[in-house]
Amino acid sequence: MARVKLIVNRDDVALKDHALFEELAALRGRISGPSTIVLHSPGLARPWNEISEFLHRHSIVEPEYAELAVCATARERDCGYIWNAHVPLARKAGVSVATIDTVRDRRPTAGLSASETSVITYVRQLIQNNRVESDVFTQLLQGHTPQWLVELTVWIGRYQALAGILNAFEVTPTMLAEELPAVPRAATAAAPVRAPLGAPRVTPITRRDQVQERHRAIFDTVAEGRGSVRGPFGILMHSPLLCRRHLDVGTFLRFNSGLEADSRELAIIATAREKDCPYIWAAHAPTARQAGLSAAIVSAVRDRGDLAGLPSVERDIVDYTRQLAQQNAVGAALFDRLQGRHGVPWLVELTCLIGHYGIVASVLNAFEVAPAPDAEPLPLGTTRKGT
């Protein structure tokens, strides 16, 4: 049973949001899944939904590979809802039963096609290691454009974000057709997390003349808000229409949500830590201090330190981020404290913020975008070795 009321009927939202409800319901015939949670924050619901609509309607990633990536992400994030919803779509797109079983059971990919192996390995490495090795990245890029691989990466990041919502709020399928069993990962030695490579794996888009005329308004919007196009946007601009939708979500979460500045920045740096993303850390650790977070809090996040000595508000936000990343679940006591302290819309926005910056980290980590050499460093430790 879900931890909060699911918004499934028009009367579940305020009168002023009825039109929004009907607009979103018309897209799929009903409100279901993550939307039943995200609609607790109506201002976020439309931009949040538009990323999924773009991916499903306009992405150049072939359905076979998109759905395989989604199923592999559901497996890595232990999300039964996404698995149940997307296994039938994967079969319809041409993914074989043997391939789906390999993903479900966490088996080695021996015997699968080279393309299937590359997609599954890409998902596993990106989620388990927060890095993708060069041979896997290169094999996927061969025969495809940077736009294709950017969009595949966002498919993975997006469904990690959706899994975070569904797992945290304990949303389960109404009708279970495809069960996702608990399957432990094979025991492997912890592997060191390497620093980003010296240069991005594709040429970032940082100049207006790199963009087709019809998409230059999107480039201009990014540049006006940040002074230049850099970091994740230099990669996302390989898919300009997707970049615009990503920008809209980030703008709401950073400037229009109910999250306080210190809570928002704390969740962002905690996500950067869990994702081993030096770029996000360098960009937001100074902002976190400016928002009022103490040096002790920032250090505890950076060093994966004990949270016992932190104030309860900050401790719970960091713990929530850690549990989602490490356990694919959130303990009931922690969830109840956050909901009781802040309310459901706030908690929805926090969860979406963590997911949004998870997408950013996926793009930065996969495409090897490093911060400036003199930026504040993020020490890197060890992680599982995804294969």
Model feature map: region roles:
Residues 1-387:
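Hydrophobic alpha-helical segments
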